[in-house]
Amino acid sequence: RTTEAFSTGNRYKEVDRDRQAGVIRSAEHAFSKDGGLAVLFGNIAE
């Protein structure tokens, strides 16, 4: 447990630099060709 909200000491050993299959991908290797970041609106965005 930590005393500071939303804090953690956990870190990955290496940075994810894989732009083809990693979490952050280049446009050429996107998860979906016609998708993008979702925009929240309404009650869920408040």
From Swiss-Prot:
Q: How is the cofactor bound?
A: Binds 1 [2Fe-2S] cluster per subunit. This cluster acts as a Lewis acid cofactor.
Which keywords describe this protein according to UniProt?
Answer: 2Fe-2S, Amino-acid biosynthesis, Branched-chain amino acid biosynthesis, Iron, Iron-sulfur, Lyase, Magnesium, Metal-binding
- Stated EC number for the protein is 4.2.1.9
Quote one Gene Ontology molecular function term: metal ion binding
Lyase listed as a keyword: yes
Any one GO biological process: isoleucine biosynthetic process
Q: In which pathway does it act?
A: Amino-acid biosynthesis; L-isoleucine biosynthesis; L-isoleucine from 2-oxobutanoate: step 3/4; Amino-acid biosynthesis; L-valine biosynthesis; L-valine from pyruvate: step 3/4
Enzyme class name: lyase
List, separated by semicolons, the cofactors it needs: [2Fe-2S] cluster; Mg(2+)
Q: Which reaction does it catalyse?
A: (2R)-2,3-dihydroxy-3-methylbutanoate = 3-methyl-2-oxobutanoate + H2O; (2R,3R)-2,3-dihydroxy-3-methylpentanoate = (S)-3-methyl-2-oxopentanoate + H2O
**Record note on quaternary structure:** Homodimer.
Briefly state the protein's biological role: Functions in the biosynthesis of branched-chain amino acids. Catalyzes the dehydration of (2R,3R)-2,3-dihydroxy-3-methylpentanoate (2,3-dihydroxy-3-methylvalerate) into 2-oxo-3-methylpentanoate (2-oxo-3-methylvalerate) and of (2R)-2,3-dihydroxy-3-methylbutanoate (2,3-dihydroxyisovalerate) into 2-oxo-3-methylbutanoate (2-oxoisovalerate), the penultimate precursor to L-isoleucine and L-valine, respectively. Is specific for the (R) isomer of 2,3-dihydroxy-3-methylbutanoate, with no catalytic activity against the (S) isomer.
Q: Which family does it belong to?
A: Belongs to the IlvD/Edd family.
Task: Supply the name of the protein.
Answer: Dihydroxy-acid dehydratase
Identify the species of origin: Rhodobacter capsulatus (Rhodopseudomonas capsulata)
What lineage does UniProt assign to this protein's organism? Bacteria, Pseudomonadati, Pseudomonadota, Alphaproteobacteria, Rhodobacterales
